[in-house]
Amino acid sequence: MRFHRVGMDGEIVIRESPESLDHQALLNSLNLDGCGAVVSFLGITRGHDNGKEIYRLEFDAWQDKLGQVLTDLANVAITRFGVKKIAMSHRIGSVAAGENIVSIHVASPHRKEAFQACEWLIDELKLQAPIWKKEVSETGESWKAGLG
């Protein structure tokens, strides 16, 4: 899945990252002309959770639907918060402890709107994206509700 749209209302870049997620390359894919702020979120796999060692997370997705959901979220954020550019990517497959899972960049003329939109995007991605997460730890494997 790879999507890049530039319109009158804003620019959206959506990328699937099955093997690795390059946070900086995703940011570099945006044209930041006219923007005075970029707020970024990078989610990584924790090595420990609730006192147990986490080896990896395994993400599965409804890939035919994922790109559209992320694009729809970006469109809502552009309209709701008045930001100008959004780039998002989420890993699918096995993600070891310490590796990048999700990257979101929001660019805007002003910082307040960028912060609000970035927080809203990660919260809504966790609620709406058709992605499922299995945790593989020292105590075994378990599917987790939501992405949080």
Task: Describe the predicted segments one by one.
Residues 1-100, 107-148:
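N-terminal, polar/charged subdomain of small-to-medium soluble alpha/beta proteins
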